Amino acid sequence: MGKKIIWVVALLLGLHTTSQAQVYIDNMYKQANAMANATIKGDYTTLLKYTHPAMIKSMGGKEQAMATIKQGVAMLKSGSLNIKKVSIGKVTQTVVEKENIQCIVPQLMDMRIAGVDAHSNNYLLGITYDGGKNWYFMNTASSTPEKLRQFLPELNKKLTIPKSNTTYK
């Protein structure tokens, strides 16, 4: 009888841990997709919401970051770069630490650049400091792990940043 109770308790604890993991992954997907949709719509307020505070600080603060994002959105609207579709793939890596949760997630983008169709396979670094309730993202396409660590010294060395690639049609 005692062994059965121990097994039931162990099973319930395992299910609880799994459900907690699913909650933070679900939140990450929801927020990464919100950011992807904001990219297509040119919604700079939402883009700023999911931009890591260290990146905002490096841009000179919220106001300057907002101006930089607005400038980027204006470039998109000018027609030289037209993002057709952005989708978020399945998490490839996750590291759970005491202070944060970090993950790598693919970001697939179909776009038109100066009249040429292109498909981009990028990777986002996602990080949360509150158990997965609120996520921040950084595109790793034009960065190295060393450069990312300048912004995020807490970046776990176990994470492998895959190389991004763009194909033109």
Role assignments for model-derived ranges:
Residues 1-26:
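Bacterial Sec-dependent N-terminal signal peptides
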Residues 93-169:
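Exposed beta-sheet edge and beta->alpha loop/turn motif
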Residues 29-30, 45-98:
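Short solvent-exposed beta->alpha transition segments
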